[in-house]
């Protein structure tokens, strides 16, 4: 926030953007097997989306002794809440900015800078969980 206040004080242009579902833009590496176990209503929803999932439904007994339907799916993209997702998103973000000629600030990895036509351009990012 202090950066935005300082930039406004200096008369710099400021723009804000949001990346909806940011973590979903990053892919899990091929050597990682992240398996998601879906049960109950989620299996019904998945089968409604694609009937082929019906062939992959398995039945298990839960801790209460009740038989429940389960669907195991391999996660291909980073999922919000997975430990590695934040890292994968940051890696994608920083690599993309580097390819565009921005330099990641070594003291604050959430800031990237680039000089274009003698003007400094700064990208600052943060995670908003609201």
Regions found by a protein language model. Give the residues of each.
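Long, low-complexity, charge-biased intrinsically disordered regions
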Residues: 1-130
């Amino acid at each position: 926030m202090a950066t935005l206040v300082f930039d406004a004080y200096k008369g710099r242009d400021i723009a804000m953007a949001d990346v909806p579902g940011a973590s979903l833009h990053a892919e899990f590496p091929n050597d990682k097997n992240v398996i998601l176990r879906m049960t109950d209503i989620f299996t019904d929803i998945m089968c409604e989306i694609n009937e082929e999932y019906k062939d992959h439904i398995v039945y298990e007994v839960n801790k209460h002794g009740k038989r429940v339907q389960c669907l195991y799916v391999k996660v291909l993209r980073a999922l919000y809440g997975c430990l590695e997702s934040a890292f994968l998103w940051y890696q994608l973000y920083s690599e993309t900015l580097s390819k565009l000629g921005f330099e990641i600030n070594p003291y604050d990895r959430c800031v990237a800078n680039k000089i274009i036509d003698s003007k400094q351009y700064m990208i600052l990012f943060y995670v908003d969980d609201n």
